[in-house]
Amino acid sequence: MKTSAIDHVVLTVPDVERTVAWWHDELGLEVLRLDEWRRGEALFVSLRVSADTLIDVLAGERTGENVNHIALVVDGVDLDELAASGRFEVEMGPADLFGARGTGRGIYIKDPDGNRVELRTYPS
């Protein structure tokens, strides 16, 4: 397995509208799925950093763990097989999930310090 990119980072924030406005107004990031989020059709709003990287903004109270997870694009691995292998304790998935390049396959695992890491693949 080879890691090739950071797909997205998820921030948990108490005021999504304020956070999205700041990242857009101050840093010029493109806002994605805001209207869908407002209608309850999307769990989070996304901010485009680059063609391949997003910051997702998830509503939630500050708990000291305000970075929800880091998502890494991985190549050369079947996530269904990896999840079944027992190599990692899988917190969620495999599942088809929205990301910087559209829908891909992902699993959530934890690093030794308890940080949530998503391993993500995309169709070729």
Predicted regions, residues:
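N-terminal beta-strand motif that seeds the catalytic metal site of vicinal oxygen chelate
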Residues: 1-18, 67-70
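Core segments of cupin and vicinal oxygen chelate
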Residues: 11-54
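Vicinal oxygen chelate
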Residues: 16, 70-116, 123
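Conserved catalytic-core motifs of GNAT/GCN5-like acyltransferases
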Residues: 30-37, 95-98, 124
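Short acidic/glycine-enriched loop/turn segments that link adjacent beta-strands
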Residues: 38-43, 64-66, 100-105
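Helix-adjacent hinge/juxtasegments
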Residues: 60, 64, 68-73
